[in-house]
């Protein structure tokens, strides 16, 4: 509690930054090397770092999808990736997916992951146990159909998502 968080969004998205701005209480800018240029991306991050305790950049699509991808931006800016992995219906495969993401591009560090849509505390423990050495589980978000994100009406479930997130991933370890 009490941390000043600055949030950015990768990609040409206009709805997500508005939602993220409400959540963070700070302006949210897009970081996209092709749209805004590398210098603009660096300047925005450096400016935010002057007074922020934590900077989060929400990616777009899959980590390695798009041109430039979220991974490309992270490498360009020297930011480690924190993948959120849909864990529904997985146990040991969760560890394989995390390992694959960490090894796919050796220039992109992946130290932690977040499990999304877990079924129970035991499921979360199984996911944690499946992770290879060097990758830890930062948090596990329970499955809750009320928090699913349909393409429309995203703002209607924002409160529920923020309440649930506040009880699960432990941001003090970031």
Locations of regions flagged by a protein language model:
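ATP-dependent carboxylate-amine ligase catalytic core
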Residues: 1-77, 85-108, 121-125
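Internal gly/pro-rich beta-alpha loop/helix module
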Residues: 91-174
């Amino acid at each position: 509690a009490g941390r000043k968080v600055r949030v950015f969004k990768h990609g040409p998205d206009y709805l997500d930054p508005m939602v993220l701005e409400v959540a963070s209480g700070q302006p949210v800018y897009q970081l996209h090397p092709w749209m805004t240029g590398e210098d603009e991306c660096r300047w925005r991050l450096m400016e935010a770092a002057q007074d922020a305790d934590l900077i989060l950049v929400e990616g777009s699509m899959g980590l390695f999808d798009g041109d430039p991808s979220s991974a490309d931006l992270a490498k360009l800016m020297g930011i480690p990736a924190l993948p959120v992995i849909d864990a529904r219906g997985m146990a040991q495969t969760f560890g394989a997916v995390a390992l694959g993401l960490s090894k796919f591009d050796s220039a992109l560090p992946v130290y932690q992951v977040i499990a999304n849509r877990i079924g129970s505390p035991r499921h979360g423990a199984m996911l944690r146990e499946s992770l290879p050495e060097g990758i830890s589980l930062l948090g596990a978000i329970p499955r809750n159909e009320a928090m699913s994100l349909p393409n429309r009406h995203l703002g209607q479930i924002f409160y529920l998502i923020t309440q649930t997130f506040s009880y699960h991933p432990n941001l003090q370890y970031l």
